Amino acid sequence: MGKIVQQCAAVVLNIALVALCMHMAAAATTTQPGHICHLPGFDQALRCIDVPVPLDYQHAADGNLNLHVTLAPALREAARPDPVFVLAGGPGQAGSDILPLLESGFRKLRATRDIVFIDQRGTGLSGKLDCDSTREVDDLDEAGQVQLIGTCMKSLNKPFRFYNTENSARDLELVRKALGYAQVNLWGGSYGTRLAQAYARLFPAAVRAMVLDGVAAPDQVIFAWGRDAQASLDATFGQCAADPGCSKAYPNLARQFAALLARVNGGEIGLDFYHPRTARRIQMRLAPARFLQTVRTVLYSADNANRLPFLIDSADKGNWNPFVAQMYSTSDFSLEGPALGLMLAVTCAEDIPRITPAMVADEERNSFLAGQEVKLVPKLCRSIDVPAIPASEPGMIAAPALLLSGALDPVTPPHRAESAARHMAHAQQFVVANAGHIVSQSGCAPRLLREFIDRPDQPLAADCLKDIPRNGFQLGAAGPHP
C-alpha cells in the first residue's frame, strides 16, 4: 500500500512539474521580457529581467541604471492579472536576497499570482553599493569605522544623491509598465513598507492593495530605535522571569546583562575563536558596537530571542562560543548583507537630518544601545555628502492595506503601524503576540496574505494569528531542556 502511495505521489509531482515547465515555456514565447534563470535561495527556475531606469528623473536623458527584477510566475495557468511586487527591507536589502520567502510567506499567493522581486537601485543585482572590506566593520572602534566606511564610499565613486526612496518608487512604476501590468499589489517588509507607502502615494491608480509587514511609520527615524529595542529586550527578560524553567535557569538575567555590558564597554572582553564560516582563527577585543548590534539583531526573531538568556548567561560565565556563533550567523530568510552604500544614501538624506539633540539624549538615557547609532551615522554621512530631503506631510493612501506587526519587534513594533494607519483610508492592522520582526511566514499568515489580496475590500478573519505559539527558552547547550 505504501509503495502504491509513493508511486501515485511521484506521478502527481511529475504532472505538477510538467505543468510548471509548460507555463514557463509559454511565458517565454509571449510578451514577457528577460530570460530563465536560477538564483541562490530558490531551486526552481525563475525569470530574470533587467529594466532600464533613469539615474536622475529630473534629467532622464543623462543616463540609465539597470534594475534587476526576478519574476516567479504563478503556478496555475489561469493566473490573476495583478502580481505581487516584493519590496525588501534595510534600506539596502535586495528582493533577490529574500527569495526563500517563496517557500514560506508567499507559497499561497504564488498559486494564482506572479511574485515579482525587485532589487532596489543600489542593492543586490541592481548595482550593489557595498565593499567586501566593510563586512565586519562593527569589530572596529568608532574612528576605525568612520575611516573604513569613508574609504569604501570613496572607492564606489557613485552619485549617491540619486539613491533615495522617491527615485526607487519611480523605478517601481517603470517596472510595472515594462512588465505590462495594469495594477499591482505590494508586499513590503521593514524599510520596504516605507517604499511601498511612497509608491502608493505617487501612483495611487497603479496600486490595487498592499501588505505591510514590520511597518515603518512616516515619522519614524531610522537608527533612532533605542526605545523600541529596549522594550523588546525588557519583554524578553519579562517572559523569561514568568517562565518557570527560564527563571530557574537564569534568576539574575537583567543584572548579568548589565554587568556584561559594562565589561564590554570597558574593553575587558578578549575573544579567541575560530570563525564559524571560514574556520579562520580570530583573536580580537569585543567592540561595544559588535556586542550591541548582535543583541539587537537577536531580538528580531522570537526564536532567536529565546536563546538570548542562554547567550548572556554563558558569556557571563566566560563561555563566549555561543554568543560568537550567533554574532556571525545570518538572518533566517536573507542570503546577503544589506548594501551599506544604499543604506547611507537613503538615511543620510531622509533620516539623519531629522535627528535632534533631544532625540540623541533620549536614546542615550532610555536604551541599552545608548544612542550609539544616532551618534555614529551622522559622522558616516560625511563620506557621501548627500543633500537633505525635507520631510513632507504624508498624504492619505487610498489602496486597501493589511498591516502586520510582531509584538516583540525591536525596530518596527505595533505602535509604528498604528501611526502609519492614520494616513490610510482602508487599513486593517493585526499584531502577532509571539513574534518579532516580519511575520508573513509565521503560522497561518501565508494563508491570510492570499485571502486579503484576493478580497482586499473585505474584513479579514485573523484570529488564527493568536494561535501562533512562542517556542520555549533555551535552558542549556542542548536546547529548551537542560
Question: How should these model regions be labeled?
Answer:
Residues 308, 312-324:
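Non-catalytic, charge-rich alpha-helical accessory subdomains
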Residues 11-23:
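Bacterial N-terminal signal peptides
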Residues 20-32:
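Bacterial Sec-dependent signal peptides at the C-terminal "C-region" and cleavage site
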Residues 29-290, 345-482:
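Gly/Pro-rich cap/lid or specificity-loop segments adjacent to the active site
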Residues 319-354:
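Long, low-complexity segments enriched in small/aliphatic residues
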Residues 1-8:
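N-terminal secretory signal peptides that target proteins for export/translocation
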Residues 299-313, 353-358, 457:
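Short helix-capping/linker segments at secondary-structure and domain boundaries
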Residues 275-293, 300-304, 333-341:
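Structural motif
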